[in-house]
From Swiss-Prot:
It catalyses: shikimate + ATP = 3-phosphoshikimate + ADP + H(+). HAMAP family: Shikimate_kinase (MF_00109). Mg(2+) binds at T19. Pathway: Metabolic intermediate biosynthesis; chorismate biosynthesis; chorismate from D-erythrose 4-phosphate and phosphoenolpyruvate: step 5/7. Pfam families: SKI (PF01202). One of its GO terms (biological process) is chorismate biosynthetic process. Substrate binds at D37, R61, G82, R138. It is found in: Cytoplasm. This is Shikimate kinase. The keyword GTP-binding does not apply. ATP binds at G15, T16, G17, K18, T19, T20, R120, Q154. Keywords: Amino-acid biosynthesis, Aromatic amino acid biosynthesis, ATP-binding, Cytoplasm, Kinase, Magnesium, Metal-binding, Nucleotide-binding, Transferase. It comes from Staphylococcus epidermidis (strain ATCC 35984 / DSM 28319 / BCRC 17069 / CCUG 31568 / BM 3577 / RP62A).
Length: 170
């Protein structure tokens, strides 16, 4: 049987299910997994909102790029933060990866998932229109690096089946 090539990098806007899908894929295929935001928090001993407060978004993006680089050689599956494509260095790293999977769904679904989540500094206190503007500003960059795009409004098992089928046919 053909094996799945790694790393598999999950990208997409906040609230599209990258962490959930990453964990599920990891368990399903016995592959190593890391949630990049969580990895940053553990290594920096601070929450993402506190990092944003201390060094700003630009400083956070620089940290994120550094940690992405180290995770690419260490983990089989990586779920990234939604804004990873905001940094040109991260974007370049991702462009050089073969299996970047873009999870996407309707902005109304995303809004329901992320509103009132204090752990998301770029969503906190944004209304639907403001979140949609941020979402829209990122779409072309997700598209630029994606090996495949998956509608994450489906069940996690359906999403993982689609990803597996595409990866095995590649």
């Amino acid at each position: 049987m053909k094996s799945i090539q790694v790393p598999i990098i999950l990208v997409g806007f906040m609230g599209t299910g990258k962490t959930t899908v990453g964990k599920y894929l990891s368990d399903l295929y016995n592959l190593s997994y890391v949630d990049l935001d969580n990895f940053i928090e553990v290594n920096e001993c601070k929450s993402i909102p506190n990092i944003f407060n201390d060094i700003g978004e630009k400083g956070f993006r620089s940290l994120e790029t550094r940690y992405l680089k180290s995770c690419l050689n260490t983990f089989d599956i990586i779920s990234t933060g939604g804004g990873i494509i905001e940094d040109t260095n991260s974007l370049k790293l991702l462009k050089n990866q073969k299996h970047v999977v873009w999870l996407d769904c309707d902005i109304e679904i995303i809004f329901k998932r992320v509103k009132n989540d204090s752990h998301r500094p770029n969503a906190k206190s944004k209304n639907l229109n403001q979140l949609d503007a941020l979402y829209s500003s990122r779409l072309s960059r997700y598209n630029e690096i994606a090996f495949m795009k998956v509608d994450s409004a489906q069940s996690v098992s359906e999403i993982c089946t689609l990803i597996k089928t595409k990866l095995l046919s590649d």
